[in-house]
UniProtKB/Swiss-Prot annotation:
Name the UniProt record assigns to this protein: Eukaryotic translation initiation factor 3 subunit E
PCI domain ranges (all copies): 255-424
Cellular component GO terms held in the UniProt record: eukaryotic 43S preinitiation complex; eukaryotic 48S preinitiation complex; eukaryotic translation initiation factor 3 complex, eIF3e
Location of this chain's protein in the cell: Cytoplasm
Biological source species: Aspergillus clavatus (strain ATCC 1007 / CBS 513.65 / DSM 816 / NCTC 3887 / NRRL 1 / QM 1276 / 107)
Described function: Component of the eukaryotic translation initiation factor 3 (eIF-3) complex, which is involved in protein synthesis of a specialized repertoire of mRNAs and, together with other initiation factors, stimulates binding of mRNA and methionyl-tRNAi to the 40S ribosome. The eIF-3 complex specifically targets and initiates translation of a subset of mRNAs involved in cell proliferation.
Subunit structure: Component of the eukaryotic translation initiation factor 3 (eIF-3) complex.
One BP annotation, GO: formation of cytoplasmic translation initiation complex
Family: Belongs to the eIF-3 subunit E family.
Gene that encodes the chain: int6
Tree of life domain: Eukaryota
This protein's record includes keyword Glycosyltransferase: no
Amino acid sequence: MADNAPPTAETLLSGAAAHPQTAEEIANQYNLLPKLIPYLDRHLVFPLLEFSSGQDDEKEVVRAKYELLKHTNMTDYVANLWKEIHNSDTIPDEFVKKREEVLSKLQEYEEESAKITQLLQDESVVANLRSDKAANLKFLEEQHGVTVEMVNSLYEYGRFQYSCGSYGNAAELLYQFRVLSTDNDKVASATWGKLASEILTTSWDAAMEEVLKVKDSIETRLFNNPLGQLQNRSWLIHWALFPFFNHDPARDALTELFFSPAYINTIQTNCPWILRYLAAAVITNRNRAHKSSGSYQKQLKDLIRVVRQEGYEYSDPITDFVKALYIDFDFEEAQKKLGEAEDVLRSDFFLVSAADAFVEAARHLISESYCKIHQRIDIKDLSTRLGLNQDEGEKWIVNLIRDTRVDAKIDYKEGTVIMNHPPQSVYQQVIEKTKGAFFRTQVLRFVFPI
């Protein structure tokens, strides 16, 4: 299509712009990978690169994987990447040498930690351990000859296993270290390492436990370090994206965490692009039957407020959809942005599995908003805005009325829906405004602590 050609009717209905971009162009324009990488451990970046294999130039992806992992101890995998890049069946001697060094170091760590590892697998020993780490260490020292150096060897061994890509072993070793160590800095580091390991083994329940442990560590260990808290919260927000969209029970807990004053302030200050994921979570929560109406409406209002505040700092088709629908009340723009949002969702590692749910929920929200501000609705017109034919639109509206229990009736003869909108009481309006003022006050308290 020529650049100056007008859009076809089909283009308008699908929400494409007058100068339409392809799905690939939209995906590339809103690719967040460069923004996400600085906040992720290199091992956590790897799944994102793997996901991009089918979207970007394959040679560039392979080279990126090599650059990402060449400093790890995943020697065999890195050597295979080198062979693929150089189209060779042989590898340089340096890879062979490093492999031997890694195997030797693994053997050394295994021997150093063998005694304490065996003790921690002995039920009679574990039965004598208590919540007091110092007392536990004293007991193990007096009864079994365990030293602080042995405990620290668990930490070093766990880190080494992680660098080798043995994430399950790393998680277990770091857990054992954390049970005994009184070194707060190393314990905090081990908790981050265990979180990454649980993510990379897709152990989502365990990962969520570690998210909460890291959160508590940030609040206590960095209590007098606001800059450190900001940086660590930023990291935690990004790491938490893995369970956020892969583990349904995590959705509520993490949405609540992200909306808490400390974390929404972190998002607005340091990483506004996270609004994409927060918006996607809130929109898709519309489909979840167990969500209470009051809780969902609060999330939606908080999201609208933040999108309005941060529009100058960050926007993409997902946040633009929220803006068009709830701030500008522009239904044509909302439908256009929904089409673009679907392309972005399907190209985003974290959101690809939520794309269908997002589109379904977004259509419901368009319908609900449209019905709220119109007294008489033309079924054909609303169907067009939803990208549906008239029969599909009619069924959609019938289901909408049934599901939301709105006071409305359908005039099949005229092809319209007549809405009965009860007026909102002054008392209710005051409550809504008070809630908004309270939220802003809480955020300001974290921005400007007294």
